[in-house]
């Protein structure tokens, strides 16, 4: 059975950048574990903010977070109250100095992580999986995606035996390095068990292949 490499890891250093940017020898395992805990904490604290990814940079004892979100107003809050609360909670929990920046995602319909989370939410609300997949694919294509592939795996429609189904529209060239492929994964917790949702979105080709900031 053919195995698929992660589209992001496949392009690291070519036209994609690392989500954690720091260097350490003896503290490496601790920092990796801490980065994971920071991301989980921020996503949980700002669950309704539509957070796609969180970039982490470390310099000395200070940590810089760059939050990519579809709803910056929810992250920042009125007069910056929400973002200050999150920063204070992070400082108290991890005993480090944090600076937090917010980047707005202007077209969440073609952000793979947000699309995957949206499909997972629909499945949890008992929307038929084929309808959720087709509706999402159509919306992403309408907003400028050159191609999209969606895969759902688990006890689909409450079936006794778990299976996977996928739906694709347009081109999704996973093995082409210059292709700008966005990838997202989410889990839908249904009454029948968990359903894994994977989304690949092809946004066009990057010809100069410079690493994105």
Curated annotation (Swiss-Prot):
CC annotations in GO: cytosolic small ribosomal subunit
Highest rank taxon of the organism: Bacteria
One annotated GO molecular function: mRNA binding
CDD domains, A to Z: KH-II_30S_S3
PROSITE patterns named among the record's database cross-references: KH_TYPE_2, RIBOSOMAL_S3
Keyword rRNA-binding: yes
GO biological process: translation
InterPro entries the record matches: KH_dom, KH_dom-like_a/b, KH_dom_type_2, KH_sf_prok-type, Ribosomal_S3_C_sf, Ribosomal_uS3_bac-typ, Ribosomal_uS3_C, Ribosomal_uS3_CS
Domain KH type-2: 38-106
UniProt keywords, alphabetically: Ribonucleoprotein, Ribosomal protein, RNA-binding, rRNA-binding
HAMAP family according to UniProt: Ribosomal_uS3_B
Family: Belongs to the universal ribosomal protein uS3 family.
PANTHER family in the cross-refs: 30S/40S RIBOSOMAL PROTEIN S3, SMALL RIBOSOMAL SUBUNIT PROTEIN US3C
Assembly and oligomerization: Part of the 30S ribosomal subunit. Forms a tight complex with proteins S10 and S14.
Function: Binds the lower part of the 30S subunit head. Binds mRNA in the 70S ribosome, positioning it for translation.
Protein name: Small ribosomal subunit protein uS3
Species, as recorded: Solidesulfovibrio magneticus (strain ATCC 700980 / DSM 13731 / RS-1)
